[in-house]
């Protein structure tokens, strides 16, 4: 097995980056592709009371255990199996169990700050930024956090105004300049997704 092709997919919250990642994932046989979500690498907070965990800024680079993420990506590149963490968004902490991820020809790394850390960037063969209007992103985040993460409307809006938007402007938006490809309209941009799939297939043939 050759060195895996690592693809980084980033963008603001609700931009459609997960949709783009899934669209690309579904174009390949499951035996040759794996998905690594940056959200899985939020730091372990077992020593912090739940009330304090609820107040943490989860859109800041310091919220992520990038050391572990980088270690796992390097292991996959070296064709080693990893144990990917599982994050519980309602408890704001890692679960005890993990998911075994085996090396594949293609590794997708998806998350809001994938291009922010230079040590992560240097491991990526293709860097994608999914660009979507802010009003669309906040609506998507609102629906997701209420339906999937047990949040209230007020808490989501307050978090967006005080944390999410400032962090987007400070860390996520500036990382756009490191992207090889900028995809507008998220997962609905079929032309861009098809172009990326063709490019990945070309890299695999080298």
Swiss-Prot record:
Localization per record: Cytoplasm
Top-rank taxon: Bacteria
Record pathway: Pyrimidine metabolism; CTP biosynthesis via salvage pathway; CTP from cytidine: step 1/3; Pyrimidine metabolism; UMP biosynthesis via salvage pathway; UMP from uridine: step 1/1
Catalytic EC class: transferase
Reactions that this protein is recorded to catalyse: uridine + ATP = UMP + ADP + H(+); cytidine + ATP = CMP + ADP + H(+)
Keywords: ATP-binding, Cytoplasm, Kinase, Nucleotide-binding, Transferase
GO terms under biological process: CTP salvage; UMP salvage
SUPFAM superfamilies reported for this sequence: P-loop containing nucleoside triphosphate hydrolases
Name of the protein described by the UniProt record: Uridine kinase
Organism field: Clostridium botulinum (strain Okra / Type B1)
Gene from which this protein is expressed: udk
């Amino acid at each position: 097995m050759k060195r895996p092709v690592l693809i980084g997919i980033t963008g603001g919250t609700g931009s459609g980056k997960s949709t783009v990642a899934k669209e690309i994932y579904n174009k390949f046989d499951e035996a040759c592709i794996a998905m690594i979500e940056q959200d899985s690498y939020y730091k372990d907070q077992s020593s912090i009371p739940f009330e304090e965990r609820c107040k943490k800024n989860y859109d800041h680079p310091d919220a992520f255990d990038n050391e572990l993420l980088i270690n796992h990506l390097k292991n996959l590149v070296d064709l080693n199996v990893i144990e990917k963490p599982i994050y519980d968004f309602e408890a704001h902490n890692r679960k005890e169990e993990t998911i075994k991820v085996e090396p594949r020809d293609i590794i997708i790394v998806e998350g809001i700050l994938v291009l922010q850390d230079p040590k992560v960037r240097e491991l990526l063969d293709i860097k994608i930024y999914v660009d979507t209007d802010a009003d669309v992103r906040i609506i998507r985040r609102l629906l997701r956090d209420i339906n999937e993460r047990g949040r209230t409307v007020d808490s989501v809006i307050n978090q967006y105004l005080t944390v999410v938007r400032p962090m987007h402007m400070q860390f996520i938006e500036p990382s756009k300049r490191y992207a090889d490809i900028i995809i507008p309209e998220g997962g609905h941009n079929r032309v861009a997704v098809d172009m990326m799939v063709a490019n990945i297939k070309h890299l695999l043939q080298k």
